[in-house]
């Protein structure tokens, strides 16, 4: 029962911050990926997006775990990750989900952030403007396509730059195609 319920859940994760060095490092291919910015109020209202609970206590599943217990487990994370300021959408397998696990008719992002090391990647690929995943050695997104899609959907695009005197990122707007 519990395993069937767990396997029927889809989880999407979001953060309140877009300028965290650790998160760009481990979630965005060491600053070479992208970050999509959404309106949190819209996610809460439309999808019941909920804040992650950070705790030093582990919640265990039991065979007879209730949906409430499973949801609490799904929304709980070690307090060592509190810097992520994470929110999650938890959806039970339903008509809003496509077969690939993608939410149908999901809201558009408000902005797109291109990793600050993306220019290095473009240069490494002989100016073939593809976002590149070195670990898997595969191209997974065409930068020009992303920029064109953003322009067509009136989405702002930024490339954070690292300041010279501090460990901080500042957003720099990119001109679209």
Q: Whereabouts are the PLM-identified features?
A:
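Catalytic-core loop-and-flanking beta/alpha module that positions acidic residues
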Residues: 1-177
